């Protein structure tokens, strides 16, 4: 019942942009949250620039997450350490708790650590998809203690969040630390397969897992062409 409510509440009933990741292991479809507009628009921009095409899932940790978006991974040699390839700007954190949190299937932005990045601004390109594990009350209480220290008591695991972490799974210790800006709506079996793959000492899969192509399949926020531009498009089509 909780899962149905999470997906059908007014917060998630709005039309959302969607992106399809075609990977060597199967397809993953992602819906982007309107509540994180800066991250949503940036992800759409990076996808539109085709920067994700041919990049690896360069960091994979079982029962935790799978990460991609390192711009240096496109032509990386086997065994090379990855994780530093990024664009030259960052995005202001958009924490939206308790609505958006690190449940299984959440898509979040990677970033530099707190010492170099105390505002917890997101990197512009690298992202991860949460797998995580299921938690019990005792372990969630310990996570809450840690979050209280890291966030000066501003991040609280609500009963609704706790229920999801206990029944579905996720990574609650990342809440309030990294911006969640989307969710996987198709292809969780692909994520499960990737997160179980054998990795090297750098957490890179021993067999390359690659995003073949990233495509915007739905974007209700794309600007509508002006009438004159539509006519020009029609003329071009007629000339062909």
Model-identified regions with their sequence ranges:
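Cyclophilin-like peptidyl-prolyl cis-trans isomerases
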Residues: 11-240
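Bacterial N-terminal signal peptides
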Residues: 1-10
